[in-house]
Curated annotation (Swiss-Prot):
Gene3D superfamilies: P-loop containing nucleotide triphosphate hydrolases. ATP binds at residues 12-19. Signal peptide: none annotated. Transmembrane segments: none annotated. This is Nucleotide-binding protein ELI_02120.
Length: 301
């Protein structure tokens, strides 16, 4: 085969959505394995790599999986990320203990670590065991407030697998007041621009409104800076692709994530379309709670 094999490890709290995520990935063309013995992962990857035109590989595991020892799994991941024939990503599905308890009670299923104790006690015990993997994971999705269809849509948007020659680009806006998006590859701070929030008739508008865009472009050096950012991004995208990186997330931030970052993200997405890309646009502080949860835990307002 030529190029790198995409390998996605899907783990997290029991009841947080691992099975749902794997079903979506299978529909997207990934080869999926659930509760696959950890000790067999490297041989399995070798077998997949030896085949012609292998599909990307998604492997699900959790505290019930045979050979599950978090620190040993992390050491395995450290070895795998050093390889030049694959690209490894770890996805951790999280959820609040209270919501997990509600889900287990609603479905009348027993939590795997609740033998001889309450479901909530089992959930808390599992959370302690899983914490090292949560810290290791590049991608964390909190499913506490997500319906199944919302989680499915997030997985489709983030992990759809195109032809190796193509590239999935996400352009997003966010507010620093709620923390940076942990999945972003490139982050641009737009707080050097004058803030429309302090203009009374623009405060309740957003970067999607023409008046906000006119205000931003009429003041300062937006056009010059934007062109430099555009040139940098267009120069980096093919270099990322050459290194086997199929997904690139470009994020623009401002204080509240409603004006400057939104306008810049929309303008950059249009520039990328004109350059032949088909970017996905996400406005974290404007979008549904689904997109908000995908980006990571909320910070203080």
């Amino acid at each position: 085969m030529s190029g790198r094999l995409d390998v996605l490890l899907v783990t997290g709290m029991s009841g947080a959505g691992k099975s749902t995520s794997l079903r979506v990935l299978e529909d997207l063309g990934w080869e999926t394995l659930d509760n696959f013995p950890i000790r067999l992962l490297e041989p399995m990857i070798g077998e997949v790599l030896s085949s012609d035109n292998p599909a990307p590989l998604a492997v699900g595991f959790d505290s019930r999986t045979r050979g599950f020892v978090p620190n040993e799994i992390i050491e395995l991941c450290k070895r795998l990320v050093q390889r030049d024939d694959l690209t490894l990503t770890t996805l951790f599905l999280d959820c609040t203990s209270e919501e997990l308890e509600r889900r287990f009670n609603e479905t009348r299923r027993h939590h795997p670590m609740a033998r001889g104790r309450t479901a909530l006690e089992g959930i808390r015990a599992e959370r302690e065991v899983m914490e090292p993997l949560r810290r290791w994971a590049e991608a964390v999705i909190d499913t506490s407030e997500l319906a199944a269809n919302e989680l499915q849509q997030l997985i489709r948007e983030q992990f759809h697998h195109d032809d190796p020659a193509s590239q999935s680009v996400t352009v997003s806006s966010f507010g620093f007041a709620r923390g940076m998006p942990p999945l972003a590859d490139l982050v641009f701070d737009m707080r050097f621009l004058d803030n429309p929030h302090w203009v009374a008739n623009l405060r309740e508008q957003t970067g999607l409104d023409p008046a906000v865009g006119e205000y931003i472009t009429a003041r300062g050096d937006f056009d010059e800076i934007f062109q430099r950012m555009r040139d940098l991004i267009l120069a980096l995208l093919p270099r990322y692709r050459a290194q086997g990186k199929a997904y690139v997330h470009v994020a623009f931030g401002c204080t509240g994530g409603r004006h400057r970052s939104v306008f810049t993200a929309e303008t950059m997405a249009q520039a990328l379309r004109e350059a032949g890309f088909s970017p996905t646009v996400v406005h974290r502080n404007l979008a549904s709670r689904a997109a908000d949860q995908f980006e990571g835990p909320q910070g203080r307002n």
